[in-house]
Amino acid sequence: NGYNPPVPSILYALKRFIKNIKLSGKIQSDGKYFSINLKETKPQNMPRYSKKRTSITLPYRGISHHKICVVSSIDENDNLLLEIVGFGRCTTDMLKDSLGLKLSNAKSINADSASAYQEFCNEYKLTLNAIPSGFHSDGAFNIFEINGVHSQLETWISKFRGISTRHLQEYLDWFVYIFTMKKRFLLNKVKTESYSKILIDNNYIQSNDIFKVKMPIDLNIAYAEYLNQS
């Protein structure tokens, strides 16, 4: 099962920092997908049957409604967005509810050729530099930067040996903060100066608040087939 680390109060204080991040100019964007992790979920609250070890192929392969979609975007100034938006492939509405709220004088987006980005860019009057499916670049346009972020994120998250979906957004915020601070400050100042700044003023959080955190997504959508059988 692996070790599920405690969620420190600082992760919730980070929301204040993340809230103020805006993306401008040239942006790269792509979807990142995570499997559902139900650690810390009590047996009586399980939305699906318990999984058993088996050699049988899983019923849902690839990107399905059993995968959590995270919109990930970075601009030319290294401002980063990682936000849980729902299940399955990214849609135009998912982009509106996440990236759409973070734009400030944005000009263009490098992304795949999915219709979701085409419709999003048309509505927000942005230039879409579409990258063909299966490629990371198309001439002068690429998504190397955001793919590099995905690689760093995977390495960083693997250190925790599994993170509950309940707290995934807080860990994504933590990663964004570390990524941002590394870009802005000397590494030896990150822990001593920058971490303390976000905890000043009204960021007091009780331990009980952490355990009352709700799921960032509705698991009934992902496990509807189990609910219909009951």
Model regions and ranges:
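Residue-level recognition of single "structural anchor" positions
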Residues: 1-230
